[in-house]
């Protein structure tokens, strides 16, 4: 059955059957089933031998809803929407209402909120301050470090560069997320290591067993392009003469460790997980290509699902368990370019990776968390009919009579222009004259700048497995790392004892609540 046939079938199923099936009995029956499931659910309080964290970069609640509809209609569910526990995370930074990915990843993976665009350091490090970032008292250790400290194997896979903003706080400490390689660092930062070097030279990076993603230009000096992988002009290029991929290899040889290095689909398929303990997969000079135009042949790049499955096959050999972080990073990239169709497809592929994972694990002993780092400026609006194409036209404006799409952006780049000049007047462009379902179509935006910007809204967190019920309310984003540490009994020193009280005594907690109450009263 073709995709078009499936979409048409779903559309007519909804239209024809809605009158007869979706009556009062239908909705009350659904509610009864959900209630029974909730009442019969039992909390899992086993120790989490394994932890898997999925991060959909820029995956806002509207992105999730739109992707659900895009995939299979309004009543369908993405992989994580079957998880029993859900919470809300506040994403603001210490110094910004709307965050970036490096600061939010530091909160998610290190349990400490910090300044905009810094990596793995606390708020005592201003953006770009190399000297401050060298103070180890300001370093924020991550869940990767905690897992390694208790003997677990660790890994991460991403569709972005392995040195990019979201994965970097797993292993690096930097005053600027842009310092991925030495050419991106100013003269005043020469005393600091670039992020790529920290991945290869320092702990915990050098002991991460599985690393997969893009970013060859950051790892290898004077990297060259190919037919399937041209030079990424958006990314920096290493030029210090070093080949960190080769240095990673030499480190593993010197420690007599079994390893493999792969750079395309056919090489990844040949990996024998039984014989390999360390795997480095760098599949692109910059980010891995968007799924809609990714080369799938032998010399092409693997999907997020394929990388995730390969990572699990290696990590699951560990008798003491593992921690794996998986980032669907191109959801964010698509949104920044104002291409909603690309963002929705990347979200569906993110769901595919989670579906594949759930078939390989036992949730009695594995905690799975799915969340996002921040929202985006895409909005889902208008009054389109049930069963409409989510990428199509919603209706005509009652003011200017011109149609508008169901998905739009509040901010966007030059390609997201909503108005054109006609007879010395500004006139809104009619999107119905274009193919709004195309992957290259740019939805209209209200404010035009260099690109579509992040949103400052809350994100959702979904969980299943040991202690998943600890996600139950509105939480600070930094709470996620604490739950992981508690569920896996990793006991990082920063949190004190394992009772959940950590360093906060009753008097301190009372004082914090009192101060909050006082400030709220004064502001009224």
Positions of PLM-derived features:
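Cleavable N-terminal signal peptides of Sec/SRP-targeted secreted and luminal proteins
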Residues: 1-18, 508-522
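A post-motif C-terminal structural segment
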Residues: 20-33, 44-49, 59-65, 69-110, ...
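Active-site-adjacent structural elements in enzyme catalytic domains
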Residues: 47-72, 135-151
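Structural beta-sheet core signal
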Residues: 53-54, 156, 370
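His/Cys-centered metal/cofactor-coordination and adjacent catalytic loops
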Residues: 120-137
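Glycine-rich phosphate/pyrophosphate-binding loops
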Residues: 139-145, 149-169, 492-495
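C-terminal GPI-anchoring signal of eukaryotic secretory precursors
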Residues: 492-511
């Amino acid at each position: 059955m073709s995709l078009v046939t499936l979409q048409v079938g779903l559309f007519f199923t909804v239209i024809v059957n809605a009158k007869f099936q979706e009556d009062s009995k239908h909705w009350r029956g659904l509610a009864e089933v959900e209630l029974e499931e909730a009442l019969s659910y039992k909390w899992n309080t086993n120790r989490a031998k394994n932890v898997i964290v999925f991060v959909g970069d820029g995956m806002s609640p509207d992105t999730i809803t739109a992707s659900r509809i895009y995939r299979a209609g309004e009543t369908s569910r993405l992989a994580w929407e079957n998880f029993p526990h859900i919470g809300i995370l506040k994403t603001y930074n210490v110094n910004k209402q709307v965050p970036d990915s490096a600061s939010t990843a530091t909160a998610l993976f290190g349990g400490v909120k910090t300044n905009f665009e810094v990596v793995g350091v606390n708020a005592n490090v201003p953006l770009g301050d190399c000297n401050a970032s060298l103070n180890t008292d300001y370093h924020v250790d991550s869940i990767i470090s905690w897992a390694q400290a208790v003997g677990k194997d660790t890994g991460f896979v991403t569709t972005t560069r392995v040195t990019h903003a979201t994965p970097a706080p797993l292993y690096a400490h930097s005053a600027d997320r842009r310092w991925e390689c030495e050419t991106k660092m100013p003269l005043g930062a020469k005393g600091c290591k670039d992020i790529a070097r920290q991945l290869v030279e320092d702990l915990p990076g050098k002991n991460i067993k599985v690393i997969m993603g893009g970013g060859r230009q950051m790892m290898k000096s004077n990297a060259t392009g190919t037919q399937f992988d041209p030079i990424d002009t958006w990314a920096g290029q290493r030029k210090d003469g070093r080949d960190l991929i080769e240095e990673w290899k030499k480190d593993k040889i010197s420690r007599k460790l079994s390893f493999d290095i792969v750079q395309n689909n056919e090489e990844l398929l040949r990996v024998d997980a039984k014989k390999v303990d360390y795997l480095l997969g760098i599949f692109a000079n910059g980010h891995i290509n968007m799924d809609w135009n990714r080369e799938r042949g032998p010399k092409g790049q693997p999907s997020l699902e394929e990388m995730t499955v390969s990572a699990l096959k290696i990590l699951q050999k560990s008798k003491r368990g593992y921690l794996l972080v998986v980032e669907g990073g191109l959801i964010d990239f698509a949104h920044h370019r104002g291409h909603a169709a690309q963002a929705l497809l990347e979200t569906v592929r993110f769901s595919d990776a989670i579906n594949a994972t759930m078939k390989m694990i036992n949730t009695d002993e594995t905690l799975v968390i799915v969340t996002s780092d921040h929202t985006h400026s895409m909005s889902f609006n208008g009054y389109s009919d049930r069963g409409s194409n989510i990428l199509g036209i919603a209706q005509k404006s009652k003011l200017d009579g011109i149609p508008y799409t169901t998905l739009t952006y509040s901010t966007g780049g030059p390609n997201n222009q909503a108005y054109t000049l006609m007879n010395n007047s500004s006139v809104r462009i009619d999107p119905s004259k274009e193919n709004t379902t195309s992957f290259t179509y740019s939805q209209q935006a209200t404010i035009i700048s260099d690109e579509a910007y992040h949103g400052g809204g809350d994100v959702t967190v979904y969980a299943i497995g040991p202690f998943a019920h600890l996600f139950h309310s509105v939480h600070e984003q930094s709470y996620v790392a604490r739950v992981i540490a508690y569920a896996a009994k990793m006991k990082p020193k920063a949190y004190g004892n394992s009772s959940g009280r950590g360093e906060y005594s009753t008097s301190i907690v009372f004082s914090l609540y009192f101060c909050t109450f006082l400030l709220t009263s004064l502001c009224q």
